[in-house]
Amino acid sequence: MWRAEGKWLPKTSRKSVSQSVFCGTSTYCVLNTVPPIEDDHGNSNSSHVKIFLPKKLLECLPKCSSLPKERHRWNTNEEIAAYLITFEKHEEWLTTSPKTRPQNGSMILYNRKKVKYRKDGYCWKKRKDGKTTREDHMKLKVQGVECLYGCYVHSSIIPTFHRRCYWLLQNPDIVLVHYLNVPAIEDCGKPCGPILCSINTDKKEWAKWTKEELIGQLKPMFHGIKWTCSNGNSSSGFSVEQLVQQILDSHQTKPQPRTHNCLCTGSLGAGSSVHHKCNSAKHRIISPKVEPRAGGYGGHSEVQHNDVSEGKHEPSHGRSTSREKRNGKVAKPALLHQNSTEVSSTNQVEVPDTTQSSPVSISSGLNSDPDMVDSPVVTGVSSMAVASVMGGLSQSATVFMSEVTNEAVYTMSPTAGPNHHLLSPDASQGLVLAVSSDGHKFAFPTTGSSDSLSMLPANVSEELVLSTTLDGGRKIPETAMNFDPDCFLNNPKQGQTYGGGGLKAEMVSTNIRHSPPAERSFGFTSVLTKEIKTEDTSFEQQMAKEAAYSSSAAAAASSSLTLTAAGSSLLPSGGGLSPSTTLEQMDFSAIDSNKDYASSFSQTGHSPHIHQTPSPSFFLQDASKPLPLEQNTHSSLSESGAAFVMPTVKTEASSQTSSCSGHVETRIESTSSLHLMQFQANFQAMAAEGEVTMETSQAAEGNEVLLKSGELQACGSEHYLQPETNGVIRSAGGVPLLPSNVVQGLYPVAQPSLGNSSNMELSLDHFDISFSNQFSDLINDFISVEGGSGTIYGHQLVSGDSAALSQSEDGARAPFTQAEMCIPCCSPQQGSLQLSSAEGGPSTMAYMHVAEVVSAASAQGALGMLQQSGRVFMVTDYSPEWSYPEGGVKVLITGPWQEASNNYSCLFDQISVPASLIQPGVLRCYCPAHDTGLVTLQVAFNNQIISNSVVFEYKARALPTLPSSQHDWLSLDDNQFRMSILERLEQMERRMAEMTGSQQHKQASGGGGSGSGSGSGAGGGQAQCASGAGTLGSCFESRVVVVCEKMMSRACWAKSKHLIHSKTFRGMTLLHLAAAQGYATLIQTLIKWRTKHADSIDLELEVDPLNVDHFSCTPLMWACALGHLEAAVVLYKWDRRAISIPDSLGRLPLGIARSRGHVKLAECLEHLQRDEQAQLGQASRIHCAPSEEPTTDSWMAQWQREAMSPPEIPKGVTVIASTNPELRRPRSEPSNYYSTEGHKDYPAPKKHKLNPESFQARQEKLLCTALSLEQPNIRKQSPRSKQPSPETISPSEGVREYSREAAPPTPETAASQASASQPVVKWSAKDLYIGVSTVQVTGNPKGTSVVKDAAPSQVRPREPMSVLMLANREVVNTEMGAYRDRTEHEDCPQPMDDIQVNMMTLAEHIIEATPDRIKQENFVPMESSALERTDPATISSTMSWLASYLADADRLPSAAHIRSAYTEPLTPSSNASLSPAGSPVSEVAFEKPSLPSAADWSEFLSASTSEKVESELAQLTLSDHEQRELYEAARLVQTAFRKYKGRPLREQQEVAAAVIQRCYRKYKQLTWIALKYALYKKMTQAAILIQSKFRSYYEQKRFQQSRRAAVLIQNFYRSYKKCGRRRPARRTAVIVQQKLRSSLLTKKQDQAARKIMRFLRRCRHSPLVDHRLYKRSERIEKGQGT
């Protein structure tokens, strides 16, 4: 309501109001009429609506002629009001239908009665209740008068995106809606505000969206936004897709495994780091094929994403591409070697797209494409990605080919004005590596010396940047590429620090002369072209005909390289190609090996304090001419090993010391062709003016001068501050040199003495690489990980004819011989040799498969070298990088592992687990359980760590995935499974295509021909997959089987060498998915495939019966849980061990099958188990394959001698090398061996994974093997010997379980122990009582030791207790029963000889183990044990139980029995009970307990006095009295046997019988005690089992309780609702009453009114009465008035 002249008027009166309000004097005017507003039925309420507006408004507001479609700022109140009061235009402006997701900036006018404008397709922030949109309402004033109403909402995805609706208070139907994304730069304080602000939303919101939906939402929001992530000089383009990708990464519900905490850098810290997609380590191998696109912008260059804005075409004068080209339909050279590859568009460096609408200029400062973090970025040059030539790009050295048009290109570099032509149309200046659209040329334009683009090596530009003489006005150029931590951690470049960048390239003008004269600058003087191959068409290798590297006047002492060429077929050799570029990106087939090229290398000038580091650049030289390297003896330059002869491609490893005088001349003597010499600089940051001699022993100190922590100036080629470099390398002249100063080129050249570095031959005679769409596979073969100071670039290409080591003339020798140097990496069987700088900085390994080159040098063995030198190998890759805390996940680790023995182990945070070599270069282990967090992972050989450490992550489960939700885990809809199967197969096909491609490259390399790669590998299979996906019926399985068989037939699987880091569906492999779907045929096909290509890593990962998913479920677990009988049987028969692997809740497959009602399945598997055990029992009696005895010189024994802590091996411990082929594991099994020796302090690893002893078949064989090793008797092993010896759990006792208290469980038998490199006691059959091994336990000097827990404090917390799964059906009584039954039903007592031997050894052991105080003559028992204190009756009762038990259990043999036993020969039948495995009495294979060894007894006895033993278990221990009694018995037995041993028994039969009888009673007492000991162990195991069972039971109980709680809540809610219903009933009653009352009132009023009316009618004709009053009362009567 508006007040006019003291009267209140209706706000929007719909009727014509009489014109009693005049504009002249009033505050409010009747404004223009509004067009009629129709109601819903289309009826116009009236002709026009008059609106009263404040007069002030009309005076101050102009009328608007038009409503802008877009405005990228908020309107002022005055502007809004002006639009809203321009009524006459509204009809023209109104939008009649709601727009879906209007773009950022849109301004739209709606009529709210006709259009539901709020349904605009965006997702707006909701209130806490989640139902209504969160709106802010406010009234806005214009000229102090409130006249506008505003309603604001903001996006729930990007909080900076708003929708604001405005309307006039007087005319609320017309609404002006404005959409705007307001990057709050002032809030963020960062130039990259919009993105930073955008990401602070909650994860829940993101979880709802797919990537496509997000892009749909975000594209319009970011329309027209120009982000400048700039530090003043530069800005960089950005796209919505990248933002979405980054947001999804930052909000992933299950984050990808991260190998480290990310430190994304760039010069701007947060600004550039936002877009860092950091799970790149995972995708190192399979790189996406990126099509470089052309672009020819004049003024700007853009690096944009593929589809940033669809359909917006800006006219551009340099357009040379069409959309088809952009989308990759036109094949172009893809010369990208990605270090990190994501299948989504990570690392795509794309040349600008001319059809892009909003150009963003880029400059040398930053990556323009946020996903390019791993790739060198375009430095100050426009659409040509020329960084690759601009300065030794160490980051995965990419050569970018782009198409050059004739347009001029501008640099945005800070040193030049925006219009400075870096590459002018005639290519007269600057340096650009480009491919022109027609002729694919490498152009090296000539440069003037003054304004040329100087290519400074890193340390030079550092000196330029940081030296005091630097020209004050010059802007320090930013780093040319972003630092990628993944790349750094896994592939650090030479001398790189964490956070350092790559080379800088800058426009160097003449005033560089003022900087210290330390650089070598290279200028190219002319241009030459020839062809390189790409795909099937070859593009020519182009090169400067005569490219003289001329040093600019700046360098007093800079060397100038002159590159002259007589012919036309030179190699492209821009100064910036880094080592990997040389081989990976170039096609050498076009090299004409008969032309002569001359090149002179001369050093011009000298300076006393220069440390020269040549930048990595090539120069070509003539083979026949000497190449003089002159060194000024007065200068401190060290050009050691400046040039070497290399028949085809050369590397020059030049390392420098701070002072090295001497004249070195190196001659080239060679007959062959082209030499590509590479200056491989090491860019060690020298101290500022170079005067300092580097005496430091840590690289860090030298670098700190230049690397100021605050500013991430990426100095040179990234210094790598590495703690491991201990010590400096001294040069020949005695001057210390940091290890990182030693730079090796393409070869592992170690340089302990720097007089000259030796070199390796790199022969590329038959080396042909074609660039096809399979390019990445080629690169796979070249992937090499560089580490640390003194890095060696590990590409080793050796061919037979050129394997001579050329020696520099001053005779400095390389520290390694030719044979050591030439280990080819081509065949996986041979170790890549790894050398490192003399003091042992880590170096590099790479597998290279070039030609099938084989060298005898491999015999030397990489590991042999390593053992002697004590150096460290690099882990080149490992997958996966993470696990949940339960562990058990299979981890594959690649590196130079070659020894085919089982002596490898992996250390996860010092927890050792055994590893096995599944093929040369690939180790497999299963990670142990561990707390969450990052841990180090290292490889050990013979318990000595031989690898660098990499980071492995244990992740906590996100709350929704905690094990309680696992009750729903083992169920999924079929479609999801099927889709996943197809996805996995597609991944494998992609791998196959890559591998096929790379193999074709390799085959083609033999002839040096065209080498066209073929990507057709995957075609057929994919078609199959597609059709499979189409018909997801019963034939789905058969279709998948067909696909698998097709893939299986390809040979490439055998050659797969690299780990795949594919994203799995919930951690499930192909085998998991097949099992979950019950596809038995598919499973059999996969098994065939796996056996056919046993070495394939891909299949190792995809098809492994013991691998577990994210909830520790094996494929067998899935099959059991979902009731697939056939699949379960196939899986069980393939690998039985899977049946004992529990899931993360500790449930076993059979248990789950039962609980889910698949009883038949459970029974079937149990039946299979029983059958097997019965067969094993019989088989083990008969077959005992004898095994050979090893020679004492076996390396295992040697190692044993070294590893023992005392120098000599204790008596009786012999090392057995495993010569038995049975001991070589089949591929599908995880490694069976735990190495205990050396890791005693580490917690035991998770046991249920590597379950050696559940695999009984092999075990029985091993047992036999072990039994056949003869040894007359076991020597005493003194309990006092400090040598720890492993405890062997006897195969029959313990039913293949793990004893939890002992050290990490040891292998099942002596023979397998031998292969696990442990000391082993040889057994003879006599030492076995019913086939149980003697058990050794660590003794301690007093002889009263108990087995030390392996770091007791650590074992228990680290391990889940769900491990003792095999024992879950056994109860102690069964063993008692079995024992009693067996002893009662034995027809024949043991032959006396064996009783003698057993009792003798038993007595010996007992006497040996008895504590000294009990042996003393004046024996006084200790204060009674806790047990006796509490209940003295217990012991006596146990003793009486013992007595009665002995009476029942065994009838003593009569003399006749004894006589027959002595007279009869040992027949097999009488000896049956002695057979090693015993008779299969019980299904669980419980045997009569063993006669424990001395060490066992000492454990048992000392447990009696141990205070730690719980009182319940104390009943199982012996009191002092019992111990004394036992000791006396043992002595008696000993003396009796000694007395009667040698005499003829016939004479003294009677006497002997009596003595033996007496001893036998004692002996049985002893066996009972042995039994008691076994029971003691069993009970502890049972306790552990009960505990684990209780845990899973408790989990279930909790789950049920939560269900109950939910039900209760539901009930409460229902009853509450009912109450609620009752209340409204009451309310209605009240309302009815009130209505009645009011109706009574109105009746009374009516009556009164009628009376008045009657009176008035009577008076109608009276002149006194006013007729108007009468009319009014009439209206009142009709109810129209009040």
From Swiss-Prot:
Residues 337-367, 599-618, 1268-1291 have a biased composition (Polar residues). It is found in: Nucleus; Cytoplasm. InterPro entries: Ankyrin_rpt, Ankyrin_rpt-contain_sf, CG-1_dom, Ig-like_fold, Ig_E-set, IPT_dom. Its main location: nucleus. GO terms for biological process: neuromuscular process controlling balance; positive regulation of calcineurin-NFAT signaling cascade; positive regulation of transcription by RNA polymerase II. It holds the Pfam family Ank_2. This is Calmodulin-binding transcription activator 1. It comes from Mus musculus. The gene is Camta1.
